[in-house]
């Protein structure tokens, strides 16, 4: 789970946006500028990323669900891959307005998606060619829009977002519902309202990979820790029972 300063440096996490596009509220996290590009202070970014990982790890160990969001072209594939590795829901194509605030309707669409997938597996021979074409088109659209959250049965316990400005609707919905936000915030965006800010480059593919992998690792470590605790508790109970049997036998 541990990420080093060198790894952040090599991934280009420190490269912000052009100075003329900066958000003054990011000033505490900016080291300076070079060639009219803001340089983000990695001495701030590293511990803040580690804090975000600790939060996610604890949440996962308690059985919480983290929704990973990254719909920008350079983030889609990585976010989907890391979310699947960690076994958590994700949004990698586009954020549908109301995905959180109107989750009841979204659940209806999820039900429809699952029914259609089952129908496809059973066979579409009874349909005409035209009906099959329309069916497949609808299924592909649903899969693209909500495929990543089809196993999310309730609202997530936290949301991880790469580029809070690009995903402002997702951020607004989470804030409205009081869902904790873990967000990568570049020099041109506002960090206010983000519970766990990760100051850093939100455009570099290498940086995006580092964030997504780090959060996925934290989720997996949290689950593993919880499982270890369960095993320890179970073995402790069986040990007590064994001692009692020994005593009664004596």
UniProtKB/Swiss-Prot annotation:
GO MF term set: structural constituent of ribosome
Any one of the GO BP annotations: translation
PROSITE patterns: RIBOSOMAL_S2_1
Record-level GO cellular component terms: cytosolic small ribosomal subunit
UniProt superkingdom: Bacteria
InterPro entries: Ribosomal_uS2, Ribosomal_uS2_bac/mit/plastid, Ribosomal_uS2_CS, Ribosomal_uS2_flav_dom_sf
Keywords: Ribonucleoprotein, Ribosomal protein
Family recorded in the similarity comment: Belongs to the universal ribosomal protein uS2 family.
HAMAP family, A to Z: Ribosomal_uS2_B
Name of this chain's protein: Small ribosomal subunit protein uS2
Organism: Delftia acidovorans (strain DSM 14801 / SPH-1)
Gene (name only): rpsB
């Amino acid at each position: 789970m541990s990420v080093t300063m060198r790894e952040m440096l090599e991934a280009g996490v420190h490269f912000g946006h052009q100075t003329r596009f900066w958000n003054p509220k990011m000033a505490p996290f900016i080291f300076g500028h070079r060639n009219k590009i803001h340089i983000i202070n990695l001495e701030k970014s590293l511990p803040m990323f580690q804090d975000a990982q600790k939060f996610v790890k604890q949440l996962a160990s308690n059985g919480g669900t983290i929704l990973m969001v990254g719909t920008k072209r350079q983030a889609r594939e990585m976010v989907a891959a890391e979310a699947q590795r960690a076994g958590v829901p994700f949004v990698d194509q586009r954020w549908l307005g109301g995905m959180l605030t109107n989750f009841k309707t979204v659940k209806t669409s999820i039900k429809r998606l699952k029914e259609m997938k089952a129908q496809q597996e059973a066979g579409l021979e009874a349909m005409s060619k035209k009906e099959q074409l329309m069916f497949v088109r609808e299924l592909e659209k649903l899969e693209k829009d909500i495929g990543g959250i089809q196993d999310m049965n309730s609202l997530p316990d936290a949301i991880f977002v790469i580029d809070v400005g690009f995903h402002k609707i997702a951020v607004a919905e989470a804030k409205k519902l009081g869902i904790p936000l873990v967000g990568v915030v570049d020099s041109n965006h506002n960090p206010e309202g983000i519970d766990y800010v990760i100051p850093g480059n939100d455009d570099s593919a290498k940086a995006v990979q580092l964030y997504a992998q780090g959060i996925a690792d934290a989720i997996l470590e949290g689950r593993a820790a919880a499982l270890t605790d369960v095993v320890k508790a179970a073995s402790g109970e069986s040990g007590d029972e064994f001692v009692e049997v020994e005593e009664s036998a004596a």
